[in-house]
Swiss-Prot record:
PANTHER family: 2-C-METHYL-D-ERYTHRITOL 4-PHOSPHATE CYTIDYLYLTRANSFERASE, CHLOROPLASTIC (PTHR32125:SF4). It catalyses: 2-C-methyl-D-erythritol 4-phosphate + CTP + H(+) = 4-CDP-2-C-methyl-D-erythritol + diphosphate. It comes from the Bacteria. The record marks 20, 27 as: Transition state stabilizer. Pathway: Isoprenoid biosynthesis; isopentenyl diphosphate biosynthesis via DXP pathway; isopentenyl diphosphate from 1-deoxy-D-xylulose 5-phosphate: step 2/6. This is 2-C-methyl-D-erythritol 4-phosphate cytidylyltransferase. Keywords: Isoprene biosynthesis, Nucleotidyltransferase, Transferase. GO terms for biological process: isopentenyl diphosphate biosynthetic process, methylerythritol 4-phosphate pathway. Catalyzes the formation of 4-diphosphocytidyl-2-C-methyl-D-erythritol from CTP and 2-C-methyl-D-erythritol 4-phosphate (MEP). GO terms for molecular function: 2-C-methyl-D-erythritol 4-phosphate cytidylyltransferase activity. It comes from Pseudomonas syringae pv. syringae (strain B728a). The record marks 161, 217 as: Positions MEP for the nucleophilic attack.
């Protein structure tokens, strides 16, 4: 009998340049513990038995990818990235559809510069959302006091942090639903900052799955220094 259980795919949008790092190359190709940030971001998925494959969206003129050992891994499929994150993810989804993936399959979108994803967080996300009608994302409840500001940088009010979460990745949604949400938002010229915001715009409510706070995205030089120090301390 044919198995109709949905498959799980990973998508890594990696076409950005990370200008705030002020580095000589895109931040995903900076070194962290003997590997690039991007390689660390990929490994958690490549080592997971439930993942069927991985699609990475890269800049058309990317000169760094081909030199990495993982570029020759048959589990990884490369597509061209877009000018924005949403376009890069959409190109990966189009590729999955072209390869015969089902609308009912799950897609986990993960930041290329988020190299510290714990296996336990990935396992928990898969376990909690595999039967969810919408999908969801790893997130962390806000810890610090939050202020809403006006355009001049002055405080308007203090925000109730008990209702605020910081969105992380992976973000996990059905292939068909995410494809439609991203495509429709692009046609409507809606600003989409992550996959969850596209699903929200489509009228759905993604579920928040609490993850580890050290699953940080490398955005500024101090983020990378923190990760290097942490890996040095824990021998990773």
């Amino acid at each position: 009998m044919k198995d109709f259980l949905p498959a799980f795919w990973a998508v890594i949008p990696a076409a950005g340049i990370g200008a705030r790092m002020a580095a000589d190359r895109p931040k995903q190709y900076l070194s962290l513990g003997g590997l690039t940030i991007l390689e660390h971001s990929l490994l958690c998925f490549l080592d997971h038995p439930r993942l069927k494959g991985l699609v990475i969206s890269l800049a058309v003129d990317d000169p760094y990818w081909a030199a990495l050992p993982c570029a020759h891994d048959t589990r990884i499929q490369r597509v061209d990235g877009g000018s924005e994150r949403s376009g890069s993810v959409l190109n990966a989804l189009l590729h999955l559809h072209a390869q015969g993936a089902s609308d009912n399959d799950w897609v986990l979108v993960h930041d290329a510069a988020r190299p510290n994803l714990a296996r336990s967080d990935l396992d928990n996300l898969l376990g909690e959302l595999a039967d969810d009608p919408v999908g969801g994302l790893l997130a962390v409840p806000a810890r610090d006091t939050l202020k809403r500001a006006d355009s001049s940088g002055r405080v308007l009010e203090t925000v109730d942090r008990s209702l605020v979460w910081q969105a992380f990745t992976p973000q996990m949604f059905r292939l068909g639903a995410l494809h439609r949400a991203l495509a429709d938002s692009l046609v409507s010229n809606v600003s989409i900052t992550d996959e969850a915001s596209a699903i929200e715009w489509a009228g759905q409510s993604p579920r928040l799955i609490e993850g580890r706070s050290d699953n940080i995205k490398v955005t500024r030089p101090e983020d990378l220094e923190w990760l290097r120090q942490r890996r040095s301390e824990f021998g990773r």
